[in-house]
């Protein structure tokens, strides 16, 4: 089975956004952001779309199969 990898931490750091701020902006907990960044949790389709919109990127630019 293929796993989903993401670039959320890299993008967040590049944009100088804290986990707390990103969580607040996306209306999720900081723990959710941590889990997604560490590939311990795959976001729902809705949250993945929100994250892509947040960074003004396509989903496939953030999430990839490894």
Go through the PLM ranges and name each one.
Residues 64-66:
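Short, charged recognition helix plus adjacent turn
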Residues 28-41:
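Recognition helix of helix-turn-helix/homeodomain-like DNA-binding domains
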